[in-house]
Amino acid sequence: MASGELVRTALYDEHVALEANIVDFHGFELPIWYSNIKEEHLATRSGAGMFDVSHMGTFRFTGPRVKEWLESVATQKVTSISDGRCAYTHFLDGDGYIIDDMIFAVVSEQEILGVPNASMISVMWDWLNDKLPVDNSVIIEDLSPKMSIIALQGPKSEKLLTSVLGKENHVGRFRWQQIMINPLGVSGWIQGTGYTGESGYELSLIHI
C-alpha cells in the first residue's frame, strides 16, 4: 500500500451502493453511518445491526505452550480458558498502562486467535514478536489481509443469523466455533462476542 493510500474492505462497493457516509478510519475507508447515528444505534438496541469491522486485525498464536506464554504477556488467566471459549484481555506496558485490548478465542490447547484494534496491528505485532520465547515454541501469524470481520449485534441477531446461516451456526455468549456448512458457502469462524452491550456475534470470514 502506498503511503497515504486508504484501504478498502471487501464490502466497500456494498457500502457505496447503500449510500453510506464513508470516512477515513485509521487508514481504512469505512462507513460511519447510513441514515444517521441515532437511528442505527436504536435499531441495534431494539433489533439488529451489522457492522463491517474488517479493519480490525486477526492474529493466530500456536505452539505447545501457547497458553502459558500468552498468560505471561496478557492480563487474562489464559490457562483457565477451555477450548471453544473466548475471553477479554489487555496487554500492559512496563508501567501498567494499557497498550491494547483483545478477545482471545481458544481453538485448542495449542492454538488461540486474537483480534487487535485497527490502529494497533503493527504495534502489537512488533510488541508480541519481541516477547516470543527464545526456543521458538510459539509462532504468531498475521491473518489480517486474508480476513473480513462482520459484527452482527442486537436482540434479534440470533434470529437473523440462523435464518441466513442455519441454526448450527449459533454460538452462545463468549463461545467460539468454526462456521459449519451453510447456504452461502462462507467459511471461517464465529464467536458470541461484541462491543455494543447487546447479544450478538462476530464472524471472521476467509477471503475466497
Language model features by range: what are they?
Residues 1-206:
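Basic, glycine/lysine-rich polyanion-binding surfaces/domains
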